[in-house]
């Protein structure tokens, strides 16, 4: 047995499923998950000594690559001053100033510890501000594991929510309406059925939890218009896309202004950080200035703030997003060409520094139904064959992949060459 196999066997006796987040267990592709020893730049190194070109990037935060010296040094310096104080620090103010500078739609920001905390808090705030209970989310979009968000669509195109996990009360889930991503008609139907009851729409501007599905040109502006028409707030969940698709996020890339924005992943530079913010009048409803309660023992943790501040300053440097886009575009084009040479039907979606691979005969993938029609079994084989080639992709056909500026063009070309060898055998 490999060292990873031995560790996984031991972990399953102590940790549910052997992992602390389900996708890490390789249930989407089968086999034994890799246990990682270290990471540097664009590479992961497992406990058995094998190196991999990494396109998971800790599920998005590592936009600068692993073990970036500026972030590492910031963490070390902050740790020498203390780990946590439970009181305000100057770094929290500096971090808030930087975030609100980089994302102009955020007049104010509240720091939390995860993307889930950000989305659940933003929804609570939207409900408190509007005095309404219902929310709209989209099939195939993921916004963390808060009860109100673990809801799937029911039997009809428009239906009251049904729980997607045991432990979520149906009476609570009924306030969540699930619409079809990239389908404005389904959203209008929800508003027309409940015109005075919907507090907010929450949406991934690029759906990254059904692989990578960009919005159609009219979708996000259409959501903005519907929210304005019916008096609801628009929450854009930029946990994945923030500072990655563009410096000011996908909202800037696509030209839409939300009322509230949720951030995570890159904002922490690899440390557990989330944030939500937006219009001043909405944020003023948050405790302690307003009645909507939200709190956190470790929110604004000085080490996490130092890591995030260092990361965002690096990400804001000229050329970062141009490099991300150039590398991702080259990889996407190369994968398409290699698949075409082998006669394998493939769609590769990409926006900025994120991309998704779909085995499908369809010309495009634009919604959850398109994703579910793709060949998952072929993806599983592709994943493991690429892993054998030393390329680590997201271990699920329903998760996006991520580029970093630490990847070199040689890494990209080596990945394309590996895919060409795999496609020939697939």
Curated annotation (Swiss-Prot):
Cofactor(s) essential for the protein: pyridoxal 5'-phosphate
Modified residues (N6-(pyridoxal phosphate)lysine): 265
One of the GO BP terms on file: protoporphyrinogen IX biosynthetic process
EC numbers on record: 5.4.3.8
Localization per record: Cytoplasm
Regions that span the bilayer: none
Protein origin, superkingdom: Bacteria
Keyword Cytoplasm belongs to the record: yes
GO molecular function terms attached to this record: glutamate-1-semialdehyde 2,1-aminomutase activity; pyridoxal phosphate binding; transaminase activity
Catalytic activity of the protein: (S)-4-amino-5-oxopentanoate = 5-aminolevulinate
Pathway: Porphyrin-containing compound metabolism; protoporphyrin-IX biosynthesis; 5-aminolevulinate from L-glutamyl-tRNA(Glu): step 2/2
Gene3D superfamilies: Aspartate Aminotransferase, domain 1, Type I PLP-dependent aspartate aminotransferase-like (Major domain)
GO cellular component: cytoplasm
Assembly and binders: Homodimer.
Protein name: Glutamate-1-semialdehyde 2,1-aminomutase
Organism for this UniProt entry: Escherichia coli O81 (strain ED1a)
């Amino acid at each position: 047995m490999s060292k990873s196999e031995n560790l996984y066997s031991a972990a399953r006796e102590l940790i549910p499923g052997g992992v602390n987040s389900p996708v890490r267990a390789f249930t989407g592709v089968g086999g034994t998950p890799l246990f990682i020893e270290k990471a540097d730049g664009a590479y992961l190194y497992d406990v058995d000594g094998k190196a991999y070109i990494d396109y998971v990037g800790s599920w998005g935060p590592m936009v600068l690559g692993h073990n970036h010296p500026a972030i590492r040094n910031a963490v070390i310096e902050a740790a020498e001053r203390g780990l946590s104080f439970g009181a305000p620090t100057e770094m929290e103010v500096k971090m808030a100033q930087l975030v609100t500078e980089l994302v102009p739609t955020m007049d104010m920001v509240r720091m939390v510890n995860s993307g889930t905390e950000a989305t659940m808090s933003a929804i609570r705030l939207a409900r408190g501000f509007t005095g309404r209970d219902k929310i709209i989310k989209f099939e195939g979009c993921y916004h963390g594991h808060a009860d109100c968000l673990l809801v799937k669509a029911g039997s009809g195109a428009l239906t009251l929510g049904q729980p997607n996990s045991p432990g979520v009360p149906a009476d609570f889930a009924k306030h969540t309406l699930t619409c079809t991503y990239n389908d404005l008609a389904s959203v209008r139907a929800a508003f027309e059925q409940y015109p005075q009851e919907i507090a907010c729409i929450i949406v991934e501007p690029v759906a990254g939890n059904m692989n990578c599905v960009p919005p159609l040109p009219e979708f996000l502006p259409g959501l903005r218009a519907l929210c304005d028409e019916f008096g609801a707030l628009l929450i854009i969940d930029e946990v994945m896309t923030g500072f990655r698709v563009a410096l000011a996020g996908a909202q800037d890339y696509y030209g839409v202004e939300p009322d509230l924005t949720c951030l995570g992943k890159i904002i922490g530079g690899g440390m557990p950080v989330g944030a939500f913010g937006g219009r001043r009048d909405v944020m003023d409803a948050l405790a302690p200035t307003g009645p909507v309660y939200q709190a956190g023992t470790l929110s604004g943790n000085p080490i996490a703030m130092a890591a995030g501040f260092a990361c965002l300053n690096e990400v804001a440097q000229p050329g970062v997003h141009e490099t991300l886009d150039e590398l991702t575009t080259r990889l996407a084009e190369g994968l398409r060409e290699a698949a075409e040479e082998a006669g394998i039907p493939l769609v590769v979606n990409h926006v900025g520094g994120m991309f998704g691979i779909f085995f499908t005969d369809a010309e495009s993938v634009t919604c959850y139904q398109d994703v579910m029609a793709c060949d998952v079994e072929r993806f599983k084989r592709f994943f493991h064959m690429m892993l054998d080639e030393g390329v680590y992709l997201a271990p699920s056909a329903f998760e996006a992949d991520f580029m970093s500026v630490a990847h070199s063009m040689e890494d990209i070309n080596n990945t394309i060459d590996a895919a060409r060898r795999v496609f020939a055998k697939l």
